[in-house]
Regions:
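Conserved, structured core segments of small domains
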Residues: 1-101
Length: 101
């Protein structure tokens, strides 16, 4: 499934990584190569990014582990669907939700 992944790197971790050999390049290079995002947007003024990528369950878990262990952050995964798919999913979900006691 396609996801928008958002993460913020804590300032202490970012400062440490900036002064390591190669800076943030090696870890971000690994993330780009391994997960092949379609788009990456950095947030001006802070160490944060949005990434759009096609991920299965194992890749989501792997990315969460990489980001938490290497960058000290837990990513937020937001599913991305077309408008048509969203309408179809929402319609089914509402029907099922109405069955709840």
């Amino acid at each position: 499934m396609r996801y928008m992944v958002y993460f913020e790197v804590p300032i202490e971790v970012g400062n440490r990584i900036d002064f390591e050999e190669g800076g943030p390049g090696p870890i971000f290079g690994h993330i780009m190569e391994r997960f092949a995002p379609d788009a990456v947007y950095s947030q001006a003024g802070m160490r944060a990014a949005f990434m759009v990528a096609e991920l299965d369950e194992a890749q989501m878990t792997e990315l969460m582990v990489v980001l938490s262990k290497k960058l000290g952050t837990y990513p937020e995964f937001t599913p991305i669907m077309s408008a048509e798919a969203t309408m179809e999913v929402a319609a089914k979900a509402i029907i099922e939700a109405k069955k709840a006691p």
